[in-house]
Amino acid sequence: AIAAAMAPPGQVATLILPADCSWNESANPAPKPESARPTSVAQKTIEQVAKVLRRGKPSVILLAGSVMLEKGLWLAGRIARASGARIIGQRVNGRTQRGTGRAVIERLPYPVKPALEMLKGTAHLILVGAKPPVSFFAWPNMPNWLTPKDCQIHTLAEGDQGGIEALEILADLLNAPSEPERLYELRIPPLPTGELTAGKVWQALAALIPAEAIISDEGITSSRDAEKWISGTPPHDWLNITGGAIGQGMPVATGAAVACPDRKVFAMQADGSGMYTLQSLWTQAREKLDVVSIIFSNRAYRILLGELKRVGVKEVGPKAGDMFSLSNPEINWVQLAEGMGVHAMRADTCEQFNKYLEASIRSPGPHLIEAVIFE
C-alpha cells in the first residue's frame, strides 16, 4: 500500500485487513518497499517536441506535478527563453515552488473567458505532466475545450513519467541558456491600512511572510489577488486546492506542519469551505503544530453565487440567497477555534489584522485569525 501510494504522480491506496489482524500474532515487520521511479520518456518523443519548438510558432508549455517544483520550473523557463514559448501551470497543482529567484510561471485561470484569452493564438500546446485544458464545469454558451480549434497538442511527459529528465534533455537539444529570462524579483509591499478586504489580507501576508513558508490555499474567491501580492516574496511552497471538492485547506496545512516542523505554515481558508474540516484545528492544538489559520470571513458561499451567475441566473431570490449565506447565524470562528484549543483572534481592520498576523508569526502556533472582510 505504501509503495502504491508513493508511485508517481501520487496515488490513493486503500488497505483492507482481516479483522483477526487485531489479535493474532503477526510475522516480522515487512521490509520497507522501494518507491517506484518515474518511467523515462522516449528520446524520439523529446526530439519531436524540440522540432516543434524550433519552428517558432506560438507555443505554450503546460506544466503540472513534479515539474512545478523549483528545478522543473527553472528548466521550463530556460526552454521558454530558447524557444519563445510561454510556460503556464495547470489550473490546479498540489504543490508549486515560487518566490524570489525562481522562474516566473503563469497559471491557467478558472473562469473560461480569461483562460481562452490566455491560450488565444496558441499553435502548439506541449503537456508536461499536465492534462489537456478543459473548462471545470459546462456553462451555457461557453466552450468546454480551452485551446484554439487549430491548436496541436503534444505530450512530452505523462504524469507518471520523468518530466524533469525530459525537460533536461529538451533544454540540451535546444541549446537553452543557463537561466530563464524571467525570475521573480523581491517586492515586499507596505502593510495595508483601513478597511479589511481579501486583497489586503494577502498584502499583509506578503509584507510579513518569512522565507521558506508553506501556504495551503483554499481561499477560493478570496484568493484572486494572491498571486499579485505573494509572487515577489521570499521563496515558499504553495499548496493549491486540487479539485472541485472543498475542505482540504486546513487538513493539508496540518499535514504540511507535521512534515516540516521547522517551517511556518499558513492556512488561507475560505469560511464556507473551512466548515467541512474544522476538526483539523483540534489536531493542530494536540500536536502543537506551527500553523497560522487565516479565515476569510465573508459569511457567504461566494463561489456558488458566482456559479449561479455563470449559468444565467440574473437575480437570486431570498430562498436561494439564504442557501448561500453564512450569516444566519453568523459563525464565530474565534469561539470554534478556542473550543478546540487554538488561540484565536478576530480582525475587521487592516491595523488589527497586521498586529495579529505579526504576533502569530513571532509565536509558535497554532493560531487562528478570523479576517472579517468587506467586499
Q: Language-model features: where?
A:
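Structural signature of the thiamine diphosphate
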Residues: 1-30, 48-59, 115-138, 172-180, ...
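Thiamine diphosphate
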Residues: 82, 225-375
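Short beta-strand segments
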Residues: 14-18, 62-64, 90, 127-129, ...
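Long, charged amphipathic helices and adjacent flexible linkers at domain junctions
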Residues: 32-45, 177-196
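Short, solvent-exposed amphipathic alpha-helical segments in soluble enzyme
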Residues: 1-4, 30-32, 73-84, 140-145, ...
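Active-site diphosphate/adenylate-binding microenvironment
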Residues: 182-262
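A general structural motif
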Residues: 35-50, 108-109, 196-197, 218-222, ...
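Glycine-rich, anion-gripping cofactor-binding loops and their flanking helix/strand elements
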Residues: 65-156, 233-263, 275-279, 310, ...
